[in-house]
Curated annotation (Swiss-Prot):
The gene is fabZ. CDD domains: FabZ. InterPro entries: FabA_FabZ (IPR013114), FabZ (IPR010084), HotDog_dom_sf (IPR029069). NCBIfam families: fabZ, PRK00006.1. Keywords: Cytoplasm, Lipid A biosynthesis, Lipid biosynthesis, Lipid metabolism, Lyase. One of its GO terms (biological process) is fatty acid biosynthetic process. GO terms for cellular component: cytoplasm; membrane. The lineage of its organism: Bacteria, Pseudomonadati, Pseudomonadota, Betaproteobacteria, Burkholderiales. Pfam families: FabA. Its EC number is 4.2.1.59. The active site is at H47. It catalyses: a (3R)-hydroxyacyl-[ACP] = a (2E)-enoyl-[ACP] + H2O. This is 3-hydroxyacyl-[acyl-carrier-protein] dehydratase FabZ. Involved in unsaturated fatty acids biosynthesis. Catalyzes the dehydration of short chain beta-hydroxyacyl-ACPs and long chain saturated and unsaturated beta-hydroxyacyl-ACPs. It is an enzyme of class 4 (lyase).
């Protein structure tokens, strides 16, 4: 899935779109996506000027956006002004290595279960073979007026 397809499925835009490409998608099960991290990211201006590191919360957001792509694809729907996929919870977040400019963040997200309208995912973000972050992510679809 290229960036044009991603833009149809995610409502996020610059500077908050954190998925550049989907390399694998197993409908309703798993997604493998990437975020190319460059020195031009706006957050590097202040985090940290002498030693730029991608904020952990943005790594989690990238995993959540990949989960959103998996969910919208599974439902065969695109977001609209009346439907939003909200990030509602996180468990067991662990950060194992810094993510720096020039890294390619590999986002590996699996659907664990759906219960009571809450989608639970297991996500791992890697740089090469090294785990940068892992977490369980919860999201839900809401219709808004």
């Amino acid at each position: 899935m290229d960036i044009h397809q991603i833009l149809k499925l995610l409502p996020h835009r610059y500077p908050f779109l954190l998925v550049d490409r989907v390399n694998e998608l197993e409908r309703g099960k798993r997604i493998l996506a990437i975020k190319n991290v460059t020195i031009n990211e706006p957050f590097f201006t202040g985090h940290f000027p002498a030693r730029p590191v991608m904020p952990g919360v943005l790594i989690l957001e990238a995993l959540a956006q990949a989960a959103g792509l998996l969910s919208f694809d599974m439902m065969g729907e695109a977001p609209g002004d009346d439907k939003v996929f909200y990030f509602v919870g996180i468990d067991g977040a662990r950060f194992k290595r810094p993510v720096e400019p020039g890294d390619q963040l590999i986002l590996d997200v699996e659907l664990d279960r759906i219960k009571g309208g809450i989608y639970k995912f297991k996500g791992v973000a890697r740089v090469g073979d090294s785990v940068a972050c892992e977490a369980e992510i919860m999201c839900t679809m809401r219709t808004v007026a």
